[in-house]
């Protein structure tokens, strides 16, 4: 094992205030220090921001200055709001320089020894792990091929958080290297071939898990850097690859639990982390519990290793394990080694933050800082981000956020947008202070700058506008004025891109106002932003929020979408295009019908003195209500037998009876069916057409009422524009 420090005990009593300084000027100019009490004071918020909406209140914010200590020691104490501009007193400069030089030498020696230990105890050291294989082995060639495949792991091993000082690193473009994905497929095939051989040892299986995990990272990284979401209608590579990676990880997990293969602690760590990143938290917990409770003592100890427990601790807490049990597991895992493991401490910090045990989290962070060298800054960065996004104490989170933005740490923090979004949601859920939300969004947008990729800015804007429209849902006038100011402000930060307006357009439907939709529509041209097909889909879909939208308006939006679809070279009308039409017509009609029925029932109930003692035949629930009743565990829409019956026409008679209801059928329903019938030749295949008719009717009862009219509808009044790429393939 790699010996990092001479620490065998969990923190007790008051932690030390002197940390090993960083051997560069940053440790002197931007120090941090903890006080033992870690008492937090309240933060007010006041930032100078252009175009601040007139309704915002801007109370004074007590500015925060970093402690003038000459050591890299985080400080969040009682003087958190104090002004202190004397970071380095002149009369202490000589002592500071001497201390800097001494510690630089100390760091050099430690790093050299640590590097040597890392080399001697490499996690994938062939000689130590028994990876050598005789050429006489019948599996020699397949083992060599397997080693060649998993060597791609080294190419993708660095994560975005593992950065040294001010240097940035990014994943390579996975799509630009098809050999990477080819290696994954070949490696899994060779895994199957070698499954029953002794050559498939824990080291080789662990490297394969590492490769699969890095495949997830590469896939996610590529998605984040795309200018637009992939069109899943066209068999998205990213979706297929995610499914393949998940299936492969599950297969290896099952083999581990069944005793067919084994993992080392690195492989187990990557396995649990991969399921966490797939958002399969319960599955990660189940695998870990099964491993530690299984009959294989080796596997049980591997999954109790600090490197693995550090990953599972916060997941366990979020899945119902009590904090005392988390502490006990932390102690048990700590006792398995004789040094302070950063992975374990990071996991305990995150679990403590989730449990609002902030003092414990801060003390562990202090010790993590003390034990960390530049080689281990990735752990500090990850923990710093956790304090921003996961700490429920907004004052603590705000302090860590400010330090990241102000570049006050010796390590360079890549401010990952997911943590900023979590911080925004925590602020909103606790305070409902939209002014504070605005300040964090504005400062984050400035931090990301003009050249940030669309995936990051869109992700931040999506959460921000979720909160914005929730805040102004019932105050359309003030909200629209504020929205105009925000658009101007954002354009000063970076050039507005199409996703920015797409997000606003999709969310402003809460106001049900045609004029606002038209304003956003015109804004694309005003800011010289060419609209992609995504914008045309949202514009059509948004008609479902306008109660007085005419059929002519909806038809025109549909025609615009079809022209754009043809322009970009689509060969058939995509599912996303049909979904936009459905939401503008069928969904609106269903919601309108349900709202009217609800109001009618409320009126009848208010006029009834006593409830009916029993159900009469007239009171018997209709089939769709029977299966959609929340008290009934059967889901009507997902039941395969009922879906098949609907598709076969078994409910046509019922639909005909419903059509004679006294409630009139809305014209949008007829428009939907006429457009579907007129453009049905441009469907991908007959199955797509079936989903648009009988399939959609399963979910929307209003469509059942008119579906029997489909074959007799006259659709000559529905125009088809001149098309060049869309072809009638479904005749």
Swiss-Prot record:
The record's account of how the chain is modified after translation: Phosphorylated. Phosphorylation promotes binding to RNA.
Phosphoserine modification, residue list: 132
Region listing for Disordered, in residue ranges: 1-29, 77-133, 590-630
One Gene Ontology biological process: aerobic respiration
Biased composition (Low complexity): 83-100
Any one GO CC term of the record: mitochondrion
Keywords: Membrane, Mitochondrion, Mitochondrion inner membrane, Phosphoprotein, Transit peptide
Gene Ontology molecular function, alphabetical: mRNA binding
Major location category of this protein: mitochondrion
Biased composition (Basic residues): 101-122
Keyword Nuclease: no
Residue spans of biased composition, Polar residues class: 1-10, 598-617
Membrane topology recorded in Swiss-Prot or TrEMBL: Peripheral membrane protein
Subcellular location: Mitochondrion inner membrane
Role played: May be involved in the processing or stability of mitochondrial mRNAs.
Family, per entry: Belongs to the RMD9 family.
Additional record remark: Present with 2080 molecules/cell in log phase SD medium.
Subunit (UniProt): Monomer.
Name of the protein in its database record: RNA-binding protein RMD9-like, mitochondrial
